Each structure stands twice: as C-alpha cells, then as structure tokens.
Amino acid sequence: MAHSTGSENPKTKRKVCGQCENKAALLVCLECGEDYCSGCFAKMHQKGALKFHRTTLLQPKSQILSNILIAAHQFIKEENPPNEGNHPAEASSKSQQKPKALLQNSSEVGATASEGGEGENPRCKVMWEMPFDEEASAQSFREALTQWRAGHQEENKEEEVHAKKPVFIFLDSVEECEVQTNLKMWTEPINIEFTEDSLSYMETLWLKKYRRTPQEQLRTMLPNTFTHPHQATAEAQCTQNENESDSDVEEIKIKSPPLFMPVEKLNIERPPPSLTIVELDDTHGAEFEDPGIAVPYRVELADSESQLSSTFTDYQTCFPCENEIHHHLIFNKGKADLLSLCLRTNSRYHKDDIKDFGNTVESCTYSDEFKKIGETTSFEKNETEKNIDPQNNKDSVDSCMSLGSKGSLPTIDSSTSFIEENSSQDTNTSLKCSNQNERSNLGNSKTAKEPLFQKVTIRKKLIKERYQGPKKFYSVDKNERLDVFPSSSIKGSHSCSEITSTVSEDKMWIPLSSLSGYAGSADALCDQQSDENPLPNMQQQKSGQKSQRPSTANIPISNPDQKDTSCLLFSYTRSKSAAAQMPSRAASEISEIEYIDVTDQSELFGGNTADRQALDTLEKELNILRKPADPSEDPHSLPSEELQAFNDNFLTLSQMSKDLLEMSRESDPHGAESSSSGRNPEIQPLLSLGDYSTDEEEDEFLDKQHVIKLPWEKRA
C-alpha cells in the first residue's frame, strides 16, 4: 500500500498531456480547457478557428487563497459531527464541486494516514473509497446556500476569524479552483480634493506661457485677490528659511486669478423709431397740432357689407410736389369709396336702359381690382347680358328695324369719362369730392339689392355664353373702342352701321375690313353727323345699347315685308364671312394717323401710278390663290334660296350707298374727292358688295381692300 502510494506521488505531481498521455503538459489552452504538450498543441491548433486559441503556461505549484475552502470544511463538520456516514457524503458532494482541489487534499491526507499505519479514523480514508450519495450532497448544498444568503451573524464572525489567517495550498492549475468570495461594501464615499499642489510643475509652466493676459496686469486689475497669497508666501519664507529657488516655487503655487474674465453685457442704445402709430378718437383734429409731420387716418372695422372709410387731413402741406402720385395712392386706399362714386355716376346714364330692357341689369359690375374699372365699358356689359339672356333674341330683330329710322352714335362708357374728368381736376377738388361723397356713397351701397361679393359670384340665370373668339382674350383700350364700334347716321334719313363682331355656328372668324379704313371713315362720318343732326345723350345711349349686338347687323330695310328675314339672313351670311379685326395699340395709332391725314389721302393715291400698278398685280395674284379648285370645297357656301335673298339684300344696300355718296358730296368737298377717286374706305365696300354673290368673292374683295389700305402706301 505504501509502495503503491509512493509510486503514484511523482505521477500526480505533474500533469500529463491530454492527447499523447506520455509527455508532461506544459501549456493550457484557454478556449479548449485542456493541457497540451508543445507538440500536441501545435498539431491540434493549425486549422480553422483553432488558430486563434490562446494559451498560458501551466503552473504546477500556484498559490491560491484557500480560506473559502477551509470555511466550507468547517461548515460541514459543524453540521454533521455525530453522523459519520453523512460526513463523507457531504465531503464527496463538495469534492464534486471542487473535484481536483479536494482530491489533492484528500490524497495528501490519505498519504499521511497510510504512513501512520493506522486507518482507524474514517475521516482519514481516501475519498474515492467512500460511498457517494448524490441526492444528499445536492440537498446539503441547497441548505448551505440558503443559510449563506440569509446571512447568520455568528457564523460569519467565525468565518472572518478563520479568514484572517489564510492558508496557502499548492494546486496544479488555476482553472481547477472555483473561488467564491464575500467582499466588504465600501461605506466611505470617495472624496477627490484639488489643492494648490495638485498642478504639476510642467502645468504651471504652461499656464505662465499661455496665459492670456500678463500676471502683472492682472495684479493691477484685481489687487484684492493677490494680498492673501503674498502674506502666505512671506510666512512660508520666515518659517522655513529656504533659499531663493524655494521662494520661487512658493510664488508659483500662488492662487492665480481666473483665466477667463467675466463677459460684460453690451447695452446697445437704440434710437427711438421714426414711425409712430397713434390711435386717434373722434377729437383727433383738435389734438393733432403739427399736421406737416404725418398724415393721420382712421380705419373703421368692416361690417357685414365690407365697408371701409378713410379720412385724410392736410394733404397738400404734407406732399406738395407729389400730388398726382399720392392722388393715386389715396384712391387706392379708398377703393370702395371711389368705386361707389363711379357706380353712382354710371347709374344716372343707365336708368332708362334698365327700364327698357325689363330685366335686372346692374349699372356696373364690381371688379376685383381697381384698374379693371376703366377697361370695362357699358357696351360690353350690355352685349354680354344680351348674349346670356335668351329672352332678348326678339329684341335684336327689333333693334335692327329701329335703326332704319333712327340714327346712332358710338357710345363711350360713362365710367371711362368719369375717370378722365377726375384726372383733369386738381388734387384739392378730387379730395373734396371723395370726402364729401364718402358717407352718401356708403349709404347707397347699403341700399343695393345684392351684396358686393354676391354680385360677382351669384347669378340669377345660368350662364351660356356664345363663342367670342379672340375678343375674349384681348383688352380693348378706351381709344380703340371708338374704332371698334362705329355707327353713323346722315340727316336722320338713312343709317349705315358696320358689323362689329360676328361669329358663325361652326365658330369660324373671318376679317371684315382693315382697321385704318374703319378709323378714318367712321370718325369722319361721326363728326359730320354730330354737326348736322345732333341727338340728346340719353337718346343716343338708348338707341346704341339696343342696337349693338355681336351677331346682328344694323341694316335699314326698305321693304317692310322682308324686315325679319333679310336682317337674319344678312347676319347669318356675315357671321360666316365677316368678323371684326381685333385692334392692337399699334393699329389704333395707325388709325389715328389716317384720321388726321384723311384729307390728303386722295392726293397721295392719285399721284403715284407705279404703286397702283403694283397693287393691281398683287390683287390678281391674291384672287388666283384665294379661288378654290372646286366650288363644292367652299365651307361657307350658302344654299340657293339664301343666295337669292342675299343678292336682293345687297342690291338694296348698293342703292343706299349711292344715296350716301351723293349726300357726302353735297356736305363735304374732301369726302367728294375721295369718293370720286373710288377709294373711300367706308363707301367703296358698300358700292361693290352688290356685284358679288358668294362668300368667296366677298372675301377676295375684302382682301383687296386690305391691300389698298396698307400703311406704307401713305409714305410713298
């Protein structure tokens, strides 16, 4: 027995390699948990993830604190002192938890017992010779764990007494020992204090070098902060009696003032604002002493009818040099007041028209912007109302017949004339008018049948507008309206009115005549009629508004049996062939120039024969190009019955044009010269239209008139 144990001792002192089991283990793999010799470790850790395994040297005699192991053995002895059978079981359970460590201890104990020669004590037996009860060891471990967690004071004190004397035992490996410690809790808080000596010597040098302001300047700025440090250095020099180097070190340790000076708040003085808002009451006129500095105005809150009132004082003294500009600005501010003034003025001229029509036609339509007041004319509004209302279809025929016996003059919107009159007046007069009529206009707007916005958005009848062509998209200026809508009457016997705008059922627009001819002849005839046969303003406007229709023609009919048919047929044919040319600003200027030089037109045309021949050749080429190959291809050809009525109608027109020519010769010698030469732009189309029977020939004739009236012909 002793020999066998003596032979096993040298083998158990050093571990054997786990792979070859022949060589002693030198390395321990931390990932694998196995002991290797150098050769076996190199063979096993060459591929894959094994290359990254870490190793440590095997320490056969490592010293560990074994106070917890001793406490565990003492606990087992105190638990089961009489029961000898349970003690080895509990010891074996502890050896299961710490197998190799306890095996070493038990082997040493067994070796000493065998050397003594007496194995009477069962505790001295080798642990592997004792029976092992797994359930009992598990139960004892649970009980020990619960008692340890409960924290018995007495047992802890005894363990602490034994723990004060640590016992070192030799183990083969660190990994084989599983230690459980009971650390003390730190009751004292950690205090970190920064003193004068906390800065190192290099840090103090850095502070001296990179200081923002020199230290002498800081002493002058903050003298109180340096009194105490100087006294402290003086006491240190007296007590310690050190040399100069030590005194320099003490000066370095003086508390320095803060590196960053406190930032002072900048008080920026702002000047008082030049603009002041003062809320004025009813007595603001007496309190306001200096009217030349500001222009006060009072704005009242808008009620349900969106009323805005503004009052202005001392306008001329404030703005002596900019009356026109501020006149516009003031009326921009009082837009509602000026709008009501315009409406009141327009309503005087439109009262009779509203009664005659018998429907609710408003005097003036409100516009969203102020600039649209001048652009909207009474003729256009009445024209659109007639187009919208289907009940006025009969009135159009009556208007054609009425103009056979009554003359009509071109009408200008009263709102346009009102604005022109206001522009010619002084600033004082305009301001007085706006201030005087302010209250009355607001009262008139209250008594209106419909509110401001309902007139714009809500209509009593459905809107079914006819196609208006490019007329809808181009703005017509007030100077150009005179050229677009001319009408004339001579001596009250006959009248000839040009067709203003016509549209066919297939919505094809064809030009009627040139703008220059329109302007020259219409203005000359209008002036002649106004001199010979003047009419009242109300009668002119009534007849003009009743007769002006975009799809009808104002033609006098001699035969009373053919009044309705001839008028409608003429409007139908002209709707397919003739349309008013939309004027532009350049065209209006040309018409004005031709109107001024209408007396010299015949002389210029008669003197230049070469230009006349060139124009004739152009007419021939134009006729060839305009003539279609097949008459069936003409999209505007009329049936035979309509053509016959059309021819009869134009025979009547030719007879009427001859009478007009004779009367113009008697009244105006210049007009006679131009008509004798055959180039009167107003009468020549009427003379020659009777010779044509188709729309195609009529278009050719109109193109010929365009060529004759070219603008560069006057320059020649």
From Swiss-Prot:
Lineage, opening ranks: Eukaryota, Metazoa, Chordata, Craniata, Vertebrata
Key word Zinc present: yes
Disulfide partners: none
Spans traversing the lipid bilayer: none
Keywords tagged on the record: Metal-binding, Zinc, Zinc-finger
Protein name as annotated: Zinc finger B-box domain-containing protein 1
Listed Basic and acidic residues bias regions: 659-671
Top-level taxon: Eukaryota
ZnF segments: B box-type: 12-58
Gene: Zbbx
